[in-house]
Structure formats: structure tokens, C-alpha cells
């Protein structure tokens, strides 16, 4: 059976080849999945796509016409997938729901600590033989109040490290409380406004939907403490970049760490060295000394990529044997039958 894997990189080839104990034929395509490249999957029973691949109505209809029966997302997010079209055409969309909450929560912590102690700037200085520490002042981690927005697996892990590891005060917000979080003495607040008003460091760990889009905007920033640090390792559009820039310029936001960006599709996972960044907000944010932007790599650990590749292959096995795990299925296809 054939799988076409879009947005292929050497690390995907390495791990899928190592874990493909089922001897599936895998067609590796370096291009992202979109209307221009979709015909590369012609004759493939499955396509395996990544977070920024474009699975629009037109793309999914073309996949269906070309014989694709199932979409395997090798990530947790699926906001670029037209689920309505997949449902109508009977195409299941399977994902990897929890490949490594530790990897992402640890990365969020690394952004907090780097922005606090300015280790990235210190490293650059020393490389230039500048051993001055002027402007490198930070704060003791225990001295600040941390607000965790979203306490699923990732948010819970960050709560644990901040509370139990550093002994810091942590408050949380989520529409559903996580008992594991309250069991370690962390209090939930009833509204986001309480997070905005009470916290020195705010870390976002929520999915992107109509309620969460631009949750960090001019109105919410105005309610925050002066000098707030904001961390986003979830979805780029949780933060309105234009409003964040205004907050950074005014000093309301002291530092911003983002592993995601709303318009990242045109840039992340690609080498644009020597090119002009045409996204004005992204170009401006990259230039700020108190902003750290990385290219959606919080998930990227050996353990996580092994889990992602293994689960993606197992999802195809489960589809072919009519034993799809409900926890991995993100849509409600009318009908779906594997090729016999």
C-alpha cells in the first residue's frame, strides 16, 4: 500500500524508514501539500501531511479524485484541514494527539528562561569578545506569578515544573479544570481577565478556534501588568502580532517568546537566508532584542519524532483494519473503506 508524505525533510525520511515495519511504499515529496503539488499523491491510498500543509476543499477533492482514502496528520493540529469536505467525501482525518507534552512544555520553559536571563544575547556578546554584563539583569524565577492558559497535557507539565521545580506561584485558566493541576496546589481563575491582571509571565497552551483567535490583543494587553512576558508555543493566531508590536514598543510587554506565528506557512521549515522577509510584522519582531521567535520546533525531540512517525504509521494500519482509535480521529466521515 502506498503513502505519499508531503513536506518531507531528511529527518522525516530517516524516522519513517526506520519505523516502517509494515513495508508500506512511501513516496516522499519535499513540497508542501497544496493545489500545485497535490497530484504527486495520485494513486496513494493515504497522504501524510504536516502542520502547515494546505488541505483546503479543492485539495481534498483532488485527493479524493486521485484515490486517496485517508489523511494522516503527523502532528496534533488540524486547523488547515477542511473537515467538512473530508466528512462529505468519507475521508477520515487521523492525527497524533499527544506525542510529547514534555518536549513542548520544556521548550516553553526554555523561552522563559532565555528571555529572562538573556542567554542568547550573552552568547552573542561573548562570541564578539564582549564580556560586559550591562543590560543582562534578570529575575529569580520564584519571584514571579505565572499564568498558564490551557491546562491539557502540555500546560499541566509546565505547571508542574514552575510550581514544584521553582516553587513559583502559578495560576491557571481553562474551560475544563484538570484535577492533576489542582492536586499540586494550583488555583484556577474564572476568567482570562484575572490571568491578564495578576501575572508577570503568561504562557499560552490552547487550541486555535473562534474563541481563542487573537486572545492576546490590544484590549487584553492593556489589562496586563506592566513589563509582562508572553510565551506562545501553541498556535500563531492566538496572538495579534500588530497589537503585540505596539505593546513591545510601549514597554507594556517586556519580552515575547514565540515558536509559532500566524503567517508562518510561507517561512517556517524553509531556508530564506539572503531573502527579504516580506511579512512586515515578522521582520520587525525578529529585529527586536527582547523577542525570540523560533520556527515551530518545540515538538522536535528524538522521543517526539519517533512517536509521531510510529503513531502515523499505526493510524494507517488501524484504518486498513477498520480499527481507528477515536482519540486520533478528528472528523466524522460519512463512510470510509480501505482498499482490499
UniProtKB/Swiss-Prot annotation:
Keyword NAD assigned: yes
Reaction(s) this enzyme catalyzes, per UniProt: (R)-lactate + NAD(+) = pyruvate + NADH + H(+)
Residues at which NAD(+) binds: 153-154, 174, 206-207, 233-235, 259
GO MF term set: D-lactate dehydrogenase activity; NAD binding
Database matches in InterPro entries: D-isomer_2_OHA_DH_cat_dom, D-isomer_DH_CS, D-isomer_DH_NAD-bd, NAD(P)-bd_dom_sf
Gene3D superfamilies listed in its UniProt record: NAD(P)-binding Rossmann-like Domain
Highest taxon above the source species: Eukaryota
Signal sequence segment: none
EC number(s) on file: 1.1.1.28
A single Gene Ontology CC term: phagocytic vesicle
Catalytic machinery residues: 235, 264, 296
Key words, A-Z: NAD, Oxidoreductase
Similarity section: Belongs to the D-isomer specific 2-hydroxyacid dehydrogenase family.
Name of this protein: Putative D-lactate dehydrogenase
Species of provenance: Dictyostelium discoideum
Gene encoding the protein: ldhA
